[in-house]
From Swiss-Prot:
InterPro entries in the cross-refs: Mediator_Med4
Protein known as: Mediator of RNA polymerase II transcription subunit 4
UniProt record similarity statement: Belongs to the Mediator complex subunit 4 family.
Swiss-Prot/TrEMBL keywords: Activator, Coiled coil, Nucleus, Transcription, Transcription regulation
Amino acid sequence: MAETDERSLRDLLLESADDLEHIVKMIVDTLINRDKSVMLKNGETVTNIIKLFDSKQDSIKTLLKRVPEFQEREQLIRTLEAHVEKRDEVIQQLETNLKSCEVALTRSCFHANQKLKQMKEAELRPVNSEMLIKLAHQISKHNSVSAPLTWQMGDPSRPFPQEHEFRAGHLLNSKVQSTGPQLLPGKNVAQRPLITSPSASSSNGGTAPIRTVGTPLINSAPTGDFSPRTGFGTDEPPPIQQQVLRGATPNEKQWQNPGVSGATSTQSPYNRVSQSPSSSPNVKLKITGLPNRPGGIDQVQDVRDVEQMSSDSSNSSDSSDDEGASKKTGSSNK
């Protein structure tokens, strides 16, 4: 009966315990009230009731033998439930990580699409690198970023790197340098010219100074205290600065020094030597926006001499007038 029944072991044990209790009550009632017992009147005997008690007791023992099997099964169920809870925690953590990865991927895809769009727009509208550097210089000069200390007004070179300097740099020529011969820095590399820019040549036919790899921008370190007016350790300002202090506005032409038999000297701010000049140079200026005057500095000097002569003649005429007036007053007094 217990094997074919689909009920649980707990229900079967409770039912068997109730039946056994009822049988025990019947036996006790039969033994106490033998004359008034209903079971005895119906033909039942105490022996049959005791046999029924024994059979019910055997069924309970059979059910109790199945208890360890059910206990092992229950322990296995609880163990499996604990493992399921752990797996649930792992799954929840994995779900959280997957969601964060999804958000990161979505954000990365969004930024990548924006970058691709910007790259396409940049390809459609290319910009010269030198123009960008000029604009960056215009922006940076308002943020306490100054030009080199050796740069002066009228210098054709710019205080920022130009496009040809970028093309001749190490970043662009890294592959060429890696395939070429290995040169020791500071020895063989310094002897090789790096920049020869035809655009940097002056208007009078001079060539721009050539920079070499491994050589600094300034040939010699300045000595002495720096002064905004005279530079490093100089008693007098350089010739160019003297002309600037006088109010001149030089262009990009080369400065000429008559003391060197008419030869022009091309100077760069990077090769400037902080020395006091022996004589003040004559400067030929060409200011845009003003009419061209015939002649040079000599005619200007002649004009100044004529003005001085006219001023002397006016002074002499004034003195003669004063003498004539004094004579007239003397004669009237007489």
